[in-house]
Amino acid sequence: MRLLLGLLTMTGAFAAGERRPNVLFFLTDDESWLERSAYGWSKLPTPAFDRVAEQGALFMNGFATAPSCGPARASVLTGRHFWQNEQGGFIQGFIPKEVPVVTRLLAASGYQVGRTGKGWGPGSHAKLGIPSNSLGKVFMREKLVNPPEGLNGTDYAANFDRFLAWRDAKKPFFFWAGVIEPHEPSGKENHVLLEKEFGVTLDQVSLPPFTEDTAGNRKKRARFIYEICCADTHLDRMLKSLKTAGELDNTLVVVSSDNGTAILSEGQHRGKASPYDFGVHVPLTMMWPAGMKPGRKVTDFVSFADLAPTFLEMAGLEVPDSMTGRSLLPILKSEKSGRIEAQRDFIMTGLEWHGEFDPTSRSSRSIRDDRFSYVVRYANVDAQGKSLDNEALMKPLKIEFYDLKKDPWELNNLADDPKFAAEKKRLADKMRKLGKESGDPRVTGEMDLFRKTRQYVQKRKRMGYKKSASLPFDE
C-alpha cells in the first residue's frame, strides 16, 4: 500500500515528459572527514571531491550512524538509526527483509539500479534478511591493469561506463559506487607513489595528535592517503562520463565514506570502531547542477539515515513510516550556507559490535552538538564472561565528556569535572530522550534481540562466516 501511495505521489510530482533526477552515490571505505583538504586540515589533492563541493554543498557535520561499515551502510539503505535496524545494526548481521530499503523502492518505481565495488556489508544474506541483489545489477567485470599493491583492482569508473551503456537512457538511474579504498591493507611502497603521482611528500602528510610523529607513521599515513587520491581519480572519470552522457545536470552526486579512518593510538581505537569524531564524522558533499545553488557550506548535523528519505523525496516518492531519517531536500534546495534547519543542532551515533569477542566490548553511544561530546561505553558480559541481564546492559561501563572547542580531538575526558556537570547532564538527558523515542535497546532495556544477534555474529566469525543451521538465526 505504501509503495502504491508512493507511485501515486510520484506521478503528481513531475510534469509529463519530465525526467526524475539520477543519483550517483560514491562511497569510499574508512575515511574521516578531515582527510579531505576541503575541511582545512590536510593537504590532500582530491580535485574531483573539491569540484563537487564547489559546485554543490560541502557538509561540515556529516556523520555515519555507526563507526563500522556494515551498520553504517545499512542505515544508508533503510533510512534508520543503526540501532533500529535490528540484526542489521551489527557488522556481519543482516537487514531484516521486511524493512524497506531505498534501492528496491526506487527500482519498483522505474529507476534502474546498479552498483560496482562494495555494496552493503559485510553481512549475511540469511533467509530472514534482504536478498543479495538489493543494490541492483552488479558491474564488476572491468579491472585495472597492473594496479599498485594494496589497491583492490576494480576499475570502478569503467564499470560505471558499462552501466551507462547498459541502461535505458529514457529512465532515471541510481548507481552505487562502493570504492573499497582506502581500506587496509596498503602497498608497502605506495608512499613513494603518492609523491610521484600526486606530488605529496612525507613532510606534507597530516598526522593526528594522538599519533607519534615518526618516519614509519608518516609512511603508513602516506600509503593510506595515496589510496584516497586514487579513489578521487575514479570520481573524476565518473563526472566526465556523466557529462558525456548528458546526465550531469540532472544527477545528484553524493560523495562520502562509510566510517572514519582506521587508526590506533597506543592500541586504542581513535578512528574507525570508536565513538569519537574521527570514527563517525565523515566527508560529505553533494552536487546537483539542475537543483542546487553551488558554493555552499552547510553546518547542519546530518546522518546517513537522512539519505534514503532524500533520494525518495527527490524522486517524488513517499517516504515509508519505517524511515526515521529526515530528507535533506529542503537543505539542498536552500540558497543559504551555515545552519539551514535550526533543529539539526546535534547528532547521536553508536556501535554494538565490530568483530570483537567477549569480554572485549566496543559497544557505545555518542551524542554531540557544536560544543560538547558525551560518550557512553557499555559492557556485554560480567567478569566471569556471563552475559549480562537487560538491566545491566543499560548501565554505563564508562562515561566520557569532551569540550570540542578546546579539545577537538577528544583527548581530555572531563566527565568528572564538576564545572561541566550541567552540560554533561543536558546531553545525557538528550541521549536518553532520543533513545527512548527511537527505541534504542540500550535505553529501553529490550536487549534480547541484540544479545542474540551478538551471539550470532560472534559464532559466524568463529566459523569463518560460513552458513550453518546451528547459528542462532535460521539460514
Residue ranges: model-predicted function:
Residues 443-457:
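Short, charged, surface-exposed hinge/linker loops at domain edges
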Residues 404-406:
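Extracellular, beta-strand-rich glycan-interacting domains
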Residues 12-399, 408-429, 436, 442-443, ...:
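Formylglycine-dependent sulfatase
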Residues 1-6:
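Sec-dependent signal peptide recognition
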